[in-house]
Regions:
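Residues that line or immediately flank small-molecule/substrate-binding pockets and catalytic motifs
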Residues: 40-42, 90, 101, 118
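Glycine-rich loop(s) and the adjacent beta-strand/alpha-helix scaffold that form part
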Residues: 102-105, 109-168
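Conserved N-terminal/central alpha/beta ligand/cofactor-binding core
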Residues: 1-76, 80-82, 126-129
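Solvent-exposed, flexible loop/coil residues
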Residues: 39, 47, 55, 90, ...
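A short, terminal or domain-edge coil/loop segment
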Residues: 20-27, 92, 133-138
């Protein structure tokens, strides 16, 4: 609430806060992800210690352990592939994707469920202009692949999008 000066959906904030501790415990207990409370550093905007990280405090270790947890749970993760098309039922259920690989090969992959995820849209000047016009001319230091694809897909499927103006 403090960092956003109260400009948030309080129900969403309370839900995230209420479930985050149980989520950390679930990752540790059910999937063996090694996480510990980060002590000695109060993250910006935080009033108490609450950040958890792997022992090395590196993103590489965290991602590796999360990938291992997904593999144990039978969840497929595709990398080095860009989704070029979604296939859905008349009711809007996604049942497959078309992907392209760096060598320009294409694959069709069926699915029972699909998580639309992207690491932001900072690499898309058009989306930055639309959602955060005050930083439209800012230098973007992230990955060029951050084009907001999941946001675009969600819109096409009729999903509601909100709170798109936040940035660090």
């Amino acid at each position: 609430f403090f960092k956003s000066k109260g400009n948030v959906d309080s129900d969403v904030v309370l839900s995230v806060c209420g479930e985050s501790g149980r989520t950390v415990e679930w990752l540790v207990d059910c999937y063996g992800v090694q996480l510990q409370l980060v002590k000695g550093f109060l993250y910006p905007g935080h009033t108490v210690l609450r950040m958890h990280a792997p022992p090395s405090r590196t993103g590489a270790e965290l991602i590796a352990s999360l990938v291992t947890a997904c593999e144990r749970a039978g969840i497929d993760i595709l990398t080095n592939a860009q989704v070029t098309k979604l296939f859905s039922t008349a009711g809007g259920m996604i049942r497959g994707v078309e992907i392209s690989r760096p060598n320009n090969s294409r694959e069709l992959i069926g699915c029972e469920a699909l998580i639309l995820a992207c690491n932001g849209y900072g690499g898309s000047p058009k989306m930055v202009e639309e959602f955060i016009p005050e930083i439209a001319n800012a230098i973007f230091a992230g990955h060029d692949g951050n084009q907001g694809d999941a946001v675009l897909w969600g819109r096409k499927l009729g999903a509601e999008i909100r709170d798109m103006g936040a940035y660090q």
